[in-house]
Every structure is written in structure tokens, then in C-alpha cells.
């Protein structure tokens, strides 16, 4: 059994924001299997799918980004899932838009949802798939305004291209593991 977690914020005002791309990614995965989200363990919504014989639990924490670890730990405890079998999908301000980056472990890199998950698990050793949201290299006056802002029309086009690839990468992880997914998907989307 695997656990895929998409990070975002629960209120409707956050739909379509850069910070909620993790929610968009897991919604795409669930929809491709005809699965719907319902009340999950802890403060989350969850969907269940089976991919090539592997049961996969997909969750969207409803705790706000900065407290995502609570929902992750609740799902891991209930389903008895170990850290090696979880994948966290989130936005990354440090990656250019149109890029995904999978890692087997690592720091939060300034992503507060990842930071709380690391604190809650007491470890940086879990897989994550970061979706680049950085549009250009100009300095931002407010990081929070940018990540909580809606995608521009051009950015939406890029995200529409990247979400199916993100879905494929996450599903590759569930069957073949993080190393295989990293080798196949750590490249810019064209």
C-alpha cells in the first residue's frame, strides 16, 4: 500500500493558486481512476485507487499547508504505511515553472508544508515530488502573495501540460519506487 499526499489549502478561495498545485495533482490522479474524495482519517479528504495491483491512498490535508503533517501521520498510522511508501506532492518556488523534481529525501527547502511533515515524522526521509511554480528570476517582494496568487493564463497552459506528467511520475513511484521515477521524470517538461 502506498500513500500519495497533495499539499494545499482547504478553502475555496485557494483553488487555482500556485500553492494548491499539490491538490490539483492528486485530484487529477484520482479523477483518472474515477475515484472521488471523501472524509478521510484525521483532518483530510481521501480517495482510494488500485494501480497495477497496488492499493494507493490519496489524501488532501484539510489542515492548511503549514499543519499538513497531522493529516499525513494520521493516514500513515491508520493504514500502517511506512515512510518509504509515501510521496508528498507540493509546489516549489525555487524550481522554474514547467519542471518537476522528485527526491527520495531532503530538507523542506522553504516549503512550510514539507517542513511540518518533517517535524511530524521526525525525519526528512520520505519521497517528494515538487512542481516548479517560479515564473522568472526577478526578486519577489512578497513570497506569500506570489504562492497564494492565482496562475496567469500562460502559467495555466504550463500546468495543464505538467499535471499529466506529474500523475504519471506519482504512479510510477507507486509501482517502481522513487529511484525509477526520479530517473524517468526529473527533467523539464517541453
Curated annotation (Swiss-Prot):
The keyword Hydrolase applies. SUPFAM superfamilies: Peptidyl-tRNA hydrolase-like. GO terms for biological process: protein quality control for misfolded or incompletely synthesized proteins; rescue of stalled ribosome. Belongs to the PTH family. It is found in: Cytoplasm. Hydrolyzes ribosome-free peptidyl-tRNAs (with 1 or more amino acids incorporated), which drop off the ribosome during protein synthesis, or as a result of ribosome stalling. Catalyzes the release of premature peptidyl moieties from peptidyl-tRNA molecules trapped in stalled 50S ribosomal subunits, and thus maintains levels of free tRNAs and 50S ribosomes. One of its GO terms (molecular function) is tRNA binding. The keyword Glycoprotein does not apply. Keywords: Cytoplasm, Hydrolase, RNA-binding, tRNA-binding. It holds the Pfam family Pept_tRNA_hydro. The record marks 9 as: Discriminates between blocked and unblocked aminoacyl-tRNA. TRNA binds at residues 14, 64, 66, 112. The gene is pth. NCBIfam families: pth. The record marks 91 as: Stabilizes the basic form of H active site to accept a proton. Its EC number is 3.1.1.29. It comes from the Bacteria. This is Peptidyl-tRNA hydrolase. Monomer. It catalyses: an N-acyl-L-alpha-aminoacyl-tRNA + H2O = an N-acyl-L-amino acid + a tRNA + H(+). The active site is at residue 19. GO terms for cellular component: cytoplasm.
Amino acid at each position: 500500500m502506498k500513500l500519495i499526499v497533495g499539499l494545499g489549502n482547504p478553502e475555496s478561495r485557494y483553488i487555482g493558486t500556485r500553492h494548491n498545485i499539490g491538490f490539483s495533482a492528486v485530484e487529477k490522479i484520482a479523477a483518472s481512476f474515477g475515484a472521488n474524495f471523501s472524509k478521510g482519517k484525521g483532518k483530510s479528504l481521501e480517495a482510494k485507487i488500485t494501480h497495477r495491483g497496488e492499493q494507493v491512498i490519496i489524501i488532501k490535508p484539510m489542515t492548511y499547508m503549514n499543519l499538513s503533517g497531522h493529516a499525513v501521520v494520521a493516514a500513515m498510522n491508520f493504514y500502517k504505511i511506512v515512510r518509504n511508501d509515501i510521496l508528498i506532492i507540493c509546489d516549489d518556488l525555487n524550481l522554474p515553472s514547467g519542471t518537476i523534481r522528485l527526491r527520495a529525501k531532503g530538507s523542506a527547502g522553504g516549503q512550510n508544508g514539507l517542513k511540518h511533515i518533517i517535524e511530524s515524522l521526525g525525519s526528512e526521509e520520505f519521497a517528494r515530488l515538487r512542481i516548479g511554480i517560479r515564473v522568472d528570476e526577478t526578486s519577489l517582494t512578497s513570497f506569500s502573495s506570489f504562492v497564494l496568487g492565482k496562475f496567469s493564463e500562460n502559467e495555466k497552459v504550463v500546468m495543464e501540460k505538467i499535471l499529466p506528467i506529474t500523475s504519471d511520475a506519482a504512479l510510477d513511484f507507486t509501482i517502481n519506487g522513487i529511484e525509477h521515477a526520479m530517473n524517468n521524470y526529473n527533467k523539464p517538461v517541453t
